[in-house]
Design a protein with these regions (language model features):
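Sec-dependent bacterial lipoprotein signal peptides
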Residues: 1-18
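Extracytoplasmic copper-binding redox domains, predominantly the cupredoxin/blue-copper superfamily
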Residues: 20-190
Length: 190
């Protein structure tokens, strides 16, 4: 995990830079064929989109090559400035931030951004795996689930997706363990 920390820090910083972009148009990747097939199952899938707005040149320069793979976006220094001022960067988000779903429905999280994200169910919202982003966002207590990530929990950009099933009636919380202000609350219904 220690060797992944610099890479994750880079990814986080790149994502923050993109969120602060002034770009008027964003090119979004198309969902994968598997995502389309799952979404076509009538009423069985609730879609959550993962957004960011990283500028590839400034994020890749600050964090490392390949951190940001989209075109245009927010410069890294602006991302850090906005995160420092507000504790979050609006372009880095899950949409919707809250939704209702039936027990047994599938939540399909699709990465429409240019950075790697996670879609991690947590008991309580908290910090993630990038200490600098935790500090700047005010999420200094790390969510334990973020410390137990597996390699396949990291969702690359380009329309890639992850699925999770609504297992019970009640509230389920999901966050990105790289950008911990990216969150959604799911209200499980019978």
């Amino acid at each position: 995990m220690r060797s992944m920390t610099p890479l994750l820090a880079l990814v986080s910083v790149v994502a923050l830079g993109t969120a602060c972009t002034d770009a008027e148009t964003v090119t979004r990747p198309a969902p994968t064929a598997a995502a389309d097939a799952r979404a076509s199952a009538e009423g069985s899938v609730r879609r959550i989109e993962m957004h960011d707005a990283c500028d590839p040149m400034s994020f890749n320069n600050a964090i490392g090559e390949g951190t940001c793979t989209r075109s245009g976006g927010m410069k890294f220094d602006r991302f850090i400035a906005q995160l420092t001022k507000r504790g979050s960067v609006g372009a880095w988000r899950f949409a919707p931030s809250e939704l209702d779903a039936r027990v047994g429905q599938t939540l399909m999280a699709i990465n429409l951004g240019g950075e790697v994200h996670t879609f991690t169910e947590v008991e309580e919202f908290g910090g993630g795996i990038v200490p600098m982003l935790n500090q700047l966002s005010g999420n200094t207590e790390v969510a334990p689930e973020c410390l137990a990530l597996e390699p396949d929990d990291f969702i690359p950009p380009g329309g890639n997706d992850a699925d999770d099933e609504v297992e019970e009636v009640g509230t389920e919380m999901y966050q990105c363990c790289i950008h911990p202000w990216m969150r959604t609350v799911v209200h499980g219904r019978a």
